[in-house]
């Protein structure tokens, strides 16, 4: 198989790589992504390590648009293969909100506690607690050729936060098949079932040739 099979150009510079820029300044997200990928031969760089990186305004109306914009902009700037994600919480009773506005649902600056409180208030008295986390992963080569995959984790919302782990809306979200929130389950379990884990697993499978013919040891 050649790099063409993973949807990228077949020129040598567009084939496999050993260094990957993860386009996030969020330390929780960087740690989670690098732990989930867990490819021994692959080294990761965070956005905070990239001097002079431009700020990418996430003004798209879909997760895919935002992920692609981040990946392409920073790949072209850095000259590195770049992986970006955009993700958020979609609540059925709120017609998909907070959606792409998940990080800043309660306004700027982004604040997890304020966002959770706003969701709790919006859901007061509503019996349908169905929700999902959705994640779109974008991988761009240095020239800006980009591909995307997506993953989701279905679940339900609690009426109050529970648990001290995780970040974002994790203390409110109970994934299907579990009685604990994302903030209560182990990191190992979350990195197996989360929306981001599912999207990253699809990324590895779809672009295995790009990821230097290496696959992470995914949990059974």
Go through the PLM ranges and name each one.
Residues 19-21, 27-220:
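Anionic-ligand binding patches
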Residues 12-15:
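Short hydrophobic targeting helices and cationic amphipathic motifs
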């Amino acid at each position: 198989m050649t790099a063409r099979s993973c949807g990228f150009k077949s020129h040598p510079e567009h084939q496999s790589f050993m260094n990957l820029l993860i386009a996030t300044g969020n330390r929780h997200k960087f740690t989670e992504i690098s732990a989930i990928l867990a490819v021994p031969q692959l080294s990761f760089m965070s956005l905070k390590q990239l001097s002079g990186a431009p700020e990418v305004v996430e003004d798209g109306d879909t997760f895919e648009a935002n992920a692609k914009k981040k990946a392409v902009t920073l790949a072209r700037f850095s000259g590195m293969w770049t992986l970006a994600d955009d993700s958020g919480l979609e609540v059925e009773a709120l017609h998909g909100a907070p959606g792409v506005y998940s990080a800043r649902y309660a306004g700027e600056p982004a604040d997890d506690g304020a966002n959770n409180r706003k969701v709790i208030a919006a859901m007061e008295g509503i019996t349908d607690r169905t929700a999902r986390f959705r994640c779109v992963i974008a991988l761009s080569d240095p020239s800006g050729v980009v591909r995307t995959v997506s993953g989701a984790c279905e679940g339900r919302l609690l009426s109050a936060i529970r648990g001290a782990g995780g970040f974002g809306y994790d203390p409110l979200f109970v994934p299907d098949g579990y009685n604990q929130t994302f903030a209560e389950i182990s990191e190992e379990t979350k990195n197996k079932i989360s929306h981001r884990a599912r999207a990253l697993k699809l990324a590895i499978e779809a672009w295995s040739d790009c990821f230097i013919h290496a696959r992470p040891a995914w949990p059974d």
